[in-house]
């Protein structure tokens, strides 16, 4: 039985290889109509392709779809004929005498009732094709190595707004509905095709490079638009400058959707993200969209512009997006924030490694922690090794050379080696191939931060009595740093009515920043009665987390 399975696996691999060798899909135009009542979708498709080798069959991935009115047209002769098409469980196979060097267009109608990927949530409809799932709602290609230009049209009731990939070109009335038409110019893998439907309001701005950025909120959340999208323009401008390659698409849009499965998804030109990140100005201090905002925008270059050939190279998507999001946060919040986040991810990675669960970055089945955080650490360490100038040049050359193509890790490393003045073999072994997290290297890097040195010194005082560390705790509380003050409060928790501890806690309530004060509210063993009346003032802090914790203490 084992050998039968292996044979089937081999044959499946050959079929995929043969498909990419015999046909190059170029463009797919579709007009789709989602039906919220039936939770179904139907549409018309025109897909253009070029035949590379003679074949009698090509296919599109399509899960449990019904098709009709299938026709084949030669682009050169404009002749059209009916052809045979077979709809299988997860594919549509088109049968004809396809000639090499010829371009064809196949048109057909389809309908489906997807069990996943197309979601109906109240008054919203949205898609999530991450990986290879777009074929559940749109005949397309699961293989991300075959990119196409996608132009979508979406038919919805007149009172709804549609957001999809590319530039919205027209909105046409169709009886009780409207057809929203979108245009893309450059190719992308099918998993990044998306649309969202809902009652949305829009605000927009233009970047320095003249890219229009559209920011959507539900009509009921218009007043939350500014805090939700705070720093978006700064992030965009920073990433374009830092990456050194202009934003590679026509538009950029961001859309919150209800009951989203992830924090965010980097659909080309149209990021969808969880409605949980839609906040007011107070909520911004507790949980905000900024990290996800920067991460998904970075994917427009890393993942969308250049796309992995297979999961072995998935860190080229997630590691890069995580790293560049960190750089954007450093630009906004400062270097201390950057090093603090690196430190926290290092702690998680070291814990995983200590448990014997460490993973190599080039393991295609690695966890998100590895792809995202270890990937970001790998880039941080590479940049330290080869220097800013070489690093930025390598990234720029890599993106420009492989724009709108598929890439491997070796493709990136070749560009690094071409500009680096040092040998990177040891870095590759330590950060890409080694399963264990290189904690010693990481902590040596962290110690280049003056803030991290102060933090490590403060942590070393945890077992010391109050009288031996009063001055250090006082300095931490009075510092501008969010994290030193919180560590000081952690060390004071449980000291009860110690005179020096009380003085320090009262100082923190009077002079500490928002997060130092929050640490008091969240600490389980605070002498609340002895800290009154200052303690009750925490109820007015600009943090719902602080207010709620104070209320229930």
Regions found by a protein language model. Name each.
Residues 406-538, 543-553:
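Beta/coil-rich, acidic/histidine-enriched accessory regions frequently appended to metallopeptidases
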Residues 1-22:
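Bacterial Sec-dependent N-terminal signal peptides
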Residues 312-380, 384-385, 402, 419, ...:
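Acidic/His/Gly-enriched intrinsically disordered linker/tail segments
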Residues 93, 227-234, 238, 288, ...:
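Extracytoplasmic/secreted proteins, especially bacterial periplasmic and envelope-associated proteins
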Residues 118, 128, 133-134, 152, ...:
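Juxtacatalytic substrate-recognition/specificity segment
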Residues 366, 375-402, 455, 465-481:
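Long hydrophobic segments that form regular secondary structure
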């Amino acid at each position: 039985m084992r050998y039968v399975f292996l044979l089937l696996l081999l044959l499946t691999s050959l079929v995929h290889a043969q498909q990419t060798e015999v046909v190059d899909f170029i463009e797919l135009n579709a007009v789709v109509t989602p039906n919220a009542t039936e939770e179904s979708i139907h549409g018309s498709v025109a897909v253009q392709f070029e035949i590379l080798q003679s074949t009698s069959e090509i296919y599109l991935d399509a899960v449990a779809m019904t098709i009709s009115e299938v026709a084949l047209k030669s682009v050169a002769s404009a002749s059209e004929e009916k052809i045979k098409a077979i709809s299988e469980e997860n594919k549509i196979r088109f049968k004809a005498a396809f000639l090499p060097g010829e371009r064809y267009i196949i048109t057909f109608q389809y309908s489906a009732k997807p069990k996943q990927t197309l979601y109906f949530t109240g008054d919203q409809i949205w898609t999530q094709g991450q990986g290879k799932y777009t074929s559940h709602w749109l005949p397309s290609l699961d293989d991300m190595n075959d990119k196409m230009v996608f132009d979508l049209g979406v038919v919805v009731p007149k009172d709804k707004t549609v957001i999809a990939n590319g530039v919205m070109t027209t909105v046409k009335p169709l009886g009780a509905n409207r057809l929203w038409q979108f245009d893309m110019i450059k190719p992308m893998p099918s998993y990044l095709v998306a649309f969202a439907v809902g009652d949305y309001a829009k605000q927009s701005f233009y970047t320095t490079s003249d890219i229009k950025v559209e920011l959507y909120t539900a009509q009921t959340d218009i007043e939350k638009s500014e805090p939700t999208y705070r720093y978006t323009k700064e992030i965009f401008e920073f990433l374009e400058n830092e990456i050194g390659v202009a934003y590679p698409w026509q538009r950029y849009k961001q859309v919150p959707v209800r009951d989203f499965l992830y924090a965010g998804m980097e659909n080309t030109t149209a990021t969808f993200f969880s409605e949980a990140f839609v906040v007011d100005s107070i909520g911004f201090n507790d949980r905000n969209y900024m990290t996800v905002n920067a991460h998904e925008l970075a994917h427009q270059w890393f993942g969308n512009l250049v796309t992995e050939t297979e999961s072995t190279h998935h860190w080229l998507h997630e590691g890069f997006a995580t790293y560049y999001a960190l750089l954007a946060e450093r630009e906004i919040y400062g270097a201390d924030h950057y090093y603090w986040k690196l430190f926290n991810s290092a702690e998680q990675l070291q814990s995983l490694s200590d448990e014997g669960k460490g993973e190599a970055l080039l393991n295609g089945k690695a966890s998100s922690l590895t792809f995202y955080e270890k990937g970001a650490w790998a880039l941080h360490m590479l940049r330290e090794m080869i220097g800013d100038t070489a690093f930025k040049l390598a990234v720029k050359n890599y993106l420009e050379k492989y724009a709108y193509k598929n890439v491997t890790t070796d493709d990136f490393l070749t560009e690094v080696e071409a500009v680096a003045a040092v040998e990177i073999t040891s870095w590759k072994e330590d950060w890409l191939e080694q399963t264990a997290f290189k904690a010693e290297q990481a902590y040596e890097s962290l110690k280049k931060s003056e803030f991290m040195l102060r933090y490590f010194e403060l942590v070393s005082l945890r077992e010391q009595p109050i009288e031996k560390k009063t001055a250090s705790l006082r300095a931490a509380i009075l510092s501008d740093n969010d994290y030193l003050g919180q560590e000081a409060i952690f060390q004071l928790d449980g000291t009860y009515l110690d005179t020096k501890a009380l003085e320090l806690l009262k100082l923190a309530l009077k002079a500490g920043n928002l997060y130092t004060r929050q640490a008091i509210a969240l600490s389980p063993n605070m002498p609340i009665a002895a800290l009154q009346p200052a303690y009750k003032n925490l109820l007015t802090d600009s943090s719902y987390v602080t207010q709620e914790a104070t209320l229930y203490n």
